[in-house]
Amino acid sequence: MLAVADVVCWAVILAMIGFVLAPTMGDRNTLGSHDWDQMESHRYLVDKTILAYHQFPFWNPYACGGHPNWGGFESGTTVVSPWLPFYLAMTLPHALRVEVWGMALLSAVGAWLLASRFTKSPAVRALVVVAFAVNGRWALQITSGHTWHLAYAWTPWVLYFYDRAVGADASLGPPRRRHVVLAGACLALMVYMGGIYPLPQTVFVVALYGVFLSMTTRSLRPIVVGAACGLLSLGLSAPKLFPILEVLRKHPRLVDSTETIDFSGFVDVLTSREQDMSSGHGGVSQWGWHEWGMYVGWPVVVALVLGVVAGRGTRESALKWAGLVCLSLGFGAFDPHAPWPLLHDLPVFQSQHVPSRWMYPALLLLLAVTASAAERLLRRAAWARGALELLLVAAVSYVAYDVGQIAHQPTRHMFTAKMPAVAESTGPFHVEPHLPRELVYEAEWAPSSLTAEMANVGTIDCGTFPAFHNYFRDQQGHVPGLGAHGVGDKDYRGEAFIPEGVGTATVTRWSPNEVAVEVHGAQPGEHVVLNQNYDPGWSARGHEVDDWLDTVRADLHEPDATVVFRYRPPTFLPGVLVFVVTLGGIGWAYRRARRARAAA
């Protein structure tokens, strides 16, 4: 019977996901709106740099006057991803749909596996999936273009492998070292795939769960295992993480976060059936409803309350308290000494806002506790369990229908922008102050970048790099670190020039990471400047370059020369070295364990 129930429940789950995302498959050649241009630009840049220029996507020359691409947390996120082959082989609109659908399915499988650690019931596992994987919040966030939210798909996987690695419940089998590696690998994927909020929140959740589990088990093993997962994730993600940290060191992202929500607003978040992008509700302080809504419906809310009250056990108590802490963070800055303002003072969390995002992982934890409470009830039912399972399958089918109906509301607007009719080019490159009129499409609150990348044109305006974002510029359009200039600007002197005024500089070969400049008639001791924002990763002829008014400058030692500027993040190779050492350590530990088993 359980096998049949498994099939039925997965049919319900897949039908729900299909219904929620069905609007994306109407016109399959459209793009998203709101924040989607930024995310589409990041993905298109990876494709163009690899396919057209045969380079690794280290630098983005097209936006803000140039900025690190691989060192951005939200950029370069398809390079180490299961979706890279699809982006390289498909059109951008088609690949976007593969990623969104794929991450929804990945989240569903992860939530199912996590629930399996707490219940044998297919229906209860399915309840965890349908209430978490593609609920109202997921739909609102993805529709708005917050593709970093997709990385939450790895959160249940991390918790699943971590729980197996700790092995606090002996009835579920002995702990395995490989699960420590797998948990670390999932955390590393969150780094590579742009989990700007999911990653620190998942690390925090694992830390909370580990501390509380150490208290309930009276053992340090959960803390040690959590630390091992963290160290492995650091090593496995080092090629991406180190450049990110280098960028954050130079351009710290510090934001205020004074958002609050009252109890009536919280009830609306979970139960109001008006959950579209333009919905308006009271009880919340700021931002659009896409930053608050998380519809799961009254049946799930009631089940969660009962589950939290009835949930008990070594792991369940630890998960419950971890979930309640995350939930309290979601209420924001309702008091100066509330959990969120205190956490927001700490490194990493200083760069985050919109604390309602904590409610999503809180929901997952409390759903797992509820699943355990339901399992205990089903065990007591003895011979009546089969009948109860049938009732639960019917109930979870209704929940899937209910949540799916509401999550369907925003996804109707997910991909509505027509693909720009812009010819893709690798022709001569130049920088404009603003996006040329002929490239403007579906203007949103931030400047568009996709069409500039397609036409091989750079812009000073941008929304792809937080440090240079138009939103943070002064009235003159300036922000620290922005040194490049666009055509028509009084300070624009070409894409390469000699500031001293003697001699000429001409770009003869151009690609995102490498620019060759031919210099004639210069005097020794002069300099050649590349019209891109300065970053320590730039070099010229194998030597470091200078920061000249926030642009890239190299020394000249002869009157005629070809100067090749190249960009690579300074911490990339050290990160690769750490990655290789980490892989070697994992391989060594695996071989040692095999030998030990063979000798036993």
Predicted regions located by residue number:
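Membrane-embedded helix bundles of polyisoprenyl
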Residues: 105-118, 123-171, 175-215, 225-244, ...
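Active-site-proximal, structured, solvent-exposed surfaces of multi-pass membrane proteins
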Residues: 328, 491-600
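Start-transfer (signal-anchor) and selected internal transmembrane alpha helices
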Residues: 1-23, 225, 390-393, 584-600
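Periplasmic/ER-lumenal interhelical loops and adjacent helix-loop junctions
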Residues: 37-58, 230, 235-309, 425-441, ...
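Membrane-interface helix-loop junctions at the exits of transmembrane helices
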Residues: 18-26, 85-90, 94, 123-145, ...
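Membrane-interface helix-loop-helix junctions at transmembrane boundaries of multi-pass membrane enzymes
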Residues: 4, 174, 216-224, 303-339, ...
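Signature aromatic-anchored transmembrane alpha helix within multi-pass, membrane-resident enzymes
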Residues: 227-234, 368, 374-404
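Membrane-interface coil-to-helix junctions
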Residues: 14-108, 130-153, 261-287, 332-340, ...
